[in-house]
Swiss-Prot record:
It comes from Sulfolobus acidocaldarius (strain ATCC 33909 / DSM 639 / JCM 8929 / NBRC 15157 / NCIMB 11770). The gene is rpl14. Belongs to the universal ribosomal protein uL14 family. It holds the Pfam family Ribosomal_L14. Part of the 50S ribosomal subunit. Forms a cluster with proteins L3 and L24e, part of which may contact the 16S rRNA in 2 intersubunit bridges. Transmembrane segments: none annotated. One of its GO terms (cellular component) is cytosolic large ribosomal subunit. This is Large ribosomal subunit protein uL14. It comes from the Archaea. The lineage of its organism: Archaea, Thermoproteota, Thermoprotei, Sulfolobales, Sulfolobaceae. InterPro entries: Ribosomal_uL14, Ribosomal_uL14_arc, Ribosomal_uL14_CS, Ribosomal_uL14_sf.
Length: 138
């Protein structure tokens, strides 16, 4: 697992993109197709405020659709795409066509062997093992 600071990162300046109970597409070939975010690691918010996550954040997901051996199970996952536009430090705005996650093992390696579709550069920098199996980094 990466260092604690790398896992949590900084949420300052990010707009709330994905929150608790958001549906996401699973972008790897681990057998899961769709999942729901049920927890966000490292969120330090206000009482009764719905926690949110952004690109490259670590979340807990529950698989809703997929192969029978992964359905109805909980996994850790990393957000690699989001539909909500976000601004990079150089001033460019980036948004993707869908909200997608990659399921990871407890040691931080991806559960699948390939990632379908592009992933954000922010996720690739924070999670280099995911970037190594990704087909495209934007």
């Amino acid at each position: 697992m990466p260092e604690k600071m790398n896992v949590l990162g900084s949420r300052k300046g990010f707009t709330p993109a994905l929150q608790h109970n958001s549906s996401v597409v699973v972008a790897d070939n681990s057998g899961a197709k769709e999942a729901v975010i049920i927890g966000i690691y490292g969120y330090r918010g206000v009482l009764r405020r719905v926690p949110f996550a952004n690109i490259a954040d670590l979340v807990m997901v529950s698989v809703r659709k997929g192969s029978p051996d992964v359905r109805k199970q909980k996994f850790k996952a990393v957000i690699v795409r989001q539909r909500m536009p976000f601004r990079r430090p150089d001033g460019t705005w980036i948004s993707f066509e869908d909200n997608a996650v990659v399921i990871i093992n407890p040691d931080g390696t991806p559960k699948g062997t390939e990632v379908r579709g592009p992933i954000a550069r922010e996720a690739a920098e924070r999670w280099p093992k995911i970037a190594s199996v990704a087909t495209m980094v934007i």
